[in-house]
Amino acid sequence: MKKLLIFTTILYFLTSCSNETSPLKQKQILYYGGDILTMNGDTPKYVEALVTNEDTIVFVGKIKEAKKIFAAAKTQNLHGKTLLPGFIDAHAHFAGFPSQAIGAQILPPPDAGADNIASLIKILKDWSTPENIELTGWIFGMGFDDSVLEEKRFPTKTDLDKVSTEHPIMIIHISGHFCVVNSKGLAMLNINSETPDPEGGLIRRVPNTNEPNGVLEELAAIPIMPKVLGPKSEAALKAFLIAGQDMALSYGYTTVQEGRAMPSSHLFLEHAAMTNFLKLDVVSYIDYSVADSLLRTDWYRDTYKNHYRIGGVKLTLDGSPQGRTAWRTQPYLIPPEGAKEGYLGYPAIPSDKDVENIYESAFRNNWQIHTHANGDAAMDQMIRTLKKVTQKYGNEGRRDVLIHGQYVREDQLDAFKNLNIIASLFPLHTFYWGDWHKEIIGDRLGNKISPTRTALNKGLRITIHTDAPVALPNLMRVLWTATNRVSRSGEIIGKNERLTPYEALKCITEWSAYQHFEEDTKGTLEVGKLADLVLLDANPLKVKIDAIKDITVLETIK
């Protein structure tokens, strides 16, 4: 078994264990002396001891019995800490973790310090050393949020030109659906006044002209991001892989998802796998536009090859609710810059027939498909087209997934239940953008975002996720938002939609394993399953729910 030690702060814990020999050298390890929470069953179950043999759990039960059967095993005293199944994020973009870990940190507080455009510019300037620029050839940063910036607007190329006119610059919006590029970058990308808006995207313009102002939306932005942010050398590639994996492991991940893999991100992960660089399991969902070729390779498989596999297809039907590109049936109360009154957002794929064809291909080939849909109009389109395909092919044994569903209506949850759809919801929004949602869609609907309790009560299978690098891949904050639903201003966003801490943990362990067809090997602590474990400094079921966000991952074992 390989042990991945995340923080130097845990050295004290390790050296205080009862045995003097490092368990790194032992095949059998007996864990005891803490809360060992199996996550097996509808109510919490604890065991006194757990024994692993290399990468497999071989015993869960009483400490007396464990010591008798496994007398030669090295013992690991947990000293009151909490041992759980390794975390499985139901939706994230692992290929973007390195950029988040390495790039300029332009997230707003509490995650970083970009609370106005001046501070954003300073952070970018401070980051712009020759060594950093050399990694990709660009100055780049991840996570600016116009809804939190004092100016309540997007930065433009004019703002970024204050950082540099010599080097190209790209900053990624916190939603991952927009970017801003400086003048040098626009020229390198050949985006100018004659460049048309792509279908499903928008190049924002300087008012009363066709000149790009630097802001790119949706399909004007998303295809170019991985090209710009890709490492430019073998040394840079190695630095990216180390940074991305260390970030995931530091938050307790043992399985991570690349939730919309383009060819470049698939090649990045394929290279990592083939060079035996991956330490945790990575499952990719390939963008529908290139799925037909990549899902016919050996990487599309039920089991991992060097910790990597393709799990299915990703379809995106609209954009970002906080960025106001999610496709709605009711107008936004505050349209984005340049939009007219009555603005509804817009579809990524306007034609129902085109969407139906994508679903039909997935069903015909027995490919799992994950569908990004945030606005209720996008979910109407999803339901309309899926109904037709399901009538033709059936859905027995399928585990197709709604990703985000931020503005889902109750009647749509009923429809998803009938279509056997798993709902992977995104309650991080309640903290990061709960106040903003209420501004742009109103109090009544704003309190219904990420309706986890309603979905669960209606009998849907649910999971929750980080969507990192949209936010940091901090699964303790995901648990905290799912159980508290408190906004930045301290307001409760939909009290009746709260999950219990145990339900929230289920969403990132057993239920997420089920979503990925991996429930036979992951998600609970049972004999025969993988020894994917995470050690926490406190038990999420025993602390006050407001303190869940402060729990620290001490160790991730894969």
Map each language-model feature to its residues.
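Acidic (Asp/Glu)-rich catalytic clusters
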Residues: 273-276, 299-308, 393-395, 416-418
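C-terminal motif of bacterial Sec signal peptides marking the signal peptidase cleavage site
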Residues: 15-16
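Divalent metal-binding segments
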Residues: 22-32, 37, 41-296, 302, ...
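Short, conserved catalytic or interaction motifs in soluble domains
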Residues: 19, 62, 538
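Non-cysteine beta-strand/loop elements that form the S-adenosyl-L-methionine
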Residues: 93, 307-325, 420-431
